[in-house]
From Swiss-Prot:
Pfam families: M20_dimer, Peptidase_M20. It comes from the Bacteria. This is Succinyl-diaminopimelate desuccinylase. It is an enzyme of class 3 (hydrolase). CDD domains: M20_DapE_proteobac. Binds 2 Zn(2+) or Co(2+) ions per subunit. It catalyses: N-succinyl-(2S,6S)-2,6-diaminopimelate + H2O = (2S,6S)-2,6-diaminopimelate + succinate. Keywords: Amino-acid biosynthesis, Cobalt, Diaminopimelate biosynthesis, Hydrolase, Lysine biosynthesis, Metal-binding, Zinc. GO terms for molecular function: acetylornithine deacetylase activity; cobalt ion binding; succinyl-diaminopimelate desuccinylase activity; zinc ion binding. Zn(2+) 2 binds at residues 107, 143, 360. PANTHER family: ACETYLORNITHINE DEACETYLASE (PTHR43808), N-ACETYL-L-CITRULLINE DEACETYLASE (PTHR43808:SF31). Zn(2+) 1 binds at residues 74, 107, 171.
Length: 387
């Protein structure tokens, strides 16, 4: 019988696929081959959307009973940037000084590799079949607009009658050291553009114009300083941040007709997207009074806030982490959005993977020892889950 591949070899094979979103570049083929070889029933599903790239996705399951534990993740990666700035090839999967280098090493091909390696070892030890079901739900559409990936793959699986009891997303959840953090939720994300209308005119005749620049500055200050909430036991306060201001005016002697400012809000579970939009519109109306003409164009959002309540599943994962690392992880909801926001509608979900310090950076890398430890943690989860 051939030796079971370890996480390092799987990760290197994945890293050598330059799967910059939305390209797959063979990454799902690597997983397809390994999982079919272990007895999984594997499905490859392509989704389309007008104006977006077609995306290949993978769903694999072994076992037919309960409980059903799903591992979820993505094989697409962000661009490497200036490849000449990398000390090792961005898609070479090289190991140097005990570190595995490559775009996606941390986010999140390394985490997927550890999950696959752990499952293969676990299955080999229990005769090839779990006492329940194990599945992998892997997309190539997470780093960009995320419309043809996890959200549709979950709908497809649900239509087939798939039921999940719990899910682990292998995103890089740890801040400083492996085992320091489990993500049990995420804040939501909502973006928009504040638009202030004025009247264009010559700067020498301001009485004949209405300058939107001072007005938008007033509104930016007002909206930035208006508290949205005071946080909760599991979430920090929501925050609104302006990210750009533009008047589309290259001239120095023309008062512009319009000013625009883009912003993003990261919000906790005290708000829904609709209630938050209403709150911001209320604050805007109060700041405008009867003088300023302003409005907001909202961007579509599917990123609501969610939290998985601590309980037996988080306790089980915590125990597996403590056994391997000696650390008791913090349960928190910090960071950006992830595909866990879609999975939470189907089952309780947590995120636990590698350390995220180098994700999206030049020379993204992870210690090989962390790959080994994360594999051991995932195997510990499997042993406890199906005990």
């Amino acid at each position: 019988m051939p030796a079971t591949p370890d996480a390092l070899s799987i990760a290197r094979d994945l890293l050598r696929c330059p799967s910059v979103t939305p390209a797959d570049a063979g990454a799902l083929d690597v997983l397809d081959r390994l999982l079919r070889g272990a007895g999984f029933e594997v499905h490859r599903v392509t989704f389309s959307e007008p104006g977006a790239a077609d995306i290949d996705n993978l769903y694999a399951r072994i076992g037919t009973g309960a409980p059903h534990l799903m591992f979820a993740g993505h094989t697409d990666v962000v661009p490497p940037g200036d490849v000449s700035a990398w000390s090792h090839g961005a898609f070479a999967g090289e190991v140097a000084d005990g570190q595995l280098y490559g775009r996606g090493a941390v986010d999140m091909k390394g985490g997927i590799a550890c999950a696959v390696a752990a499952v293969l070892v676990y299955l080999a030890a229990c005769g090839g079949q779990p006492k329940g079901s194990i599945s992998f739900l892997i997309t190539g559409d997470e780093e960009d607009i995320a419309v043809n990936g996890t959200v549709k793959l979950l709908q497809w699986a649900d239509a087939r009658g798939e039921n999940f009891d719990h899910c682990i997303v292998g995103e890089p959840s740890n801040v400083e050291e492996l085992g320091d953090c489990i993500k049990i939720g995420r804040r939501g994300s909502l973006s928009g553009t504040l638009i202030v209308d004025g009247v264009q005119g010559h700067v020498a005749y301001p009485q004949r114009a209405v300058n939107p620049v001072p007005d938008i500055a007033t509104l930016i200050v007002a909206l930035s300083h208006e508290p949205l909430d005071h946080g909760t036991a599991q979430f920090q306060p929501s925050n609104l941040e302006f990210t750009s201001v533009d008047v589309g005016n290259a001239a120095t002697n023309v008062i512009p007709a319009q000013a625009r400012a883009k912003f993003n809000i990261r919000f906790n579970d005290q708000h829904s997207i609709k209630s938050l939009q209403a709150l911001i519109e209320h604050h805007l109306a109060a700041a405008c009074g009867n003088r300023i003409r302003a409005r907001i164009e909202w961007l579509p959002s599917n990123a609501g806030a969610f939290v998985t309540k601590p309980g037996p599943f988080t306790d089980l994962v915590t125990a597996a982490i403590e056994q391997v690392t000696g650390r008791r992880p913090e349960l928190n909801t910090g960071g950006g959005t992830s595909d866990a926001r879609f999975i939470t509608h189907y089952c309780p979900v947590i995120e636990f993977g590698l350390v995220g310090q180098t994700m999206h950076k030049v020379d993204e890398r992870t210690p090989v020892s962390d790959l080994e430890k994360l594999t051991a943690i995932y195997r510990g989860v499997l042993e406890r889950y199906f005990a």
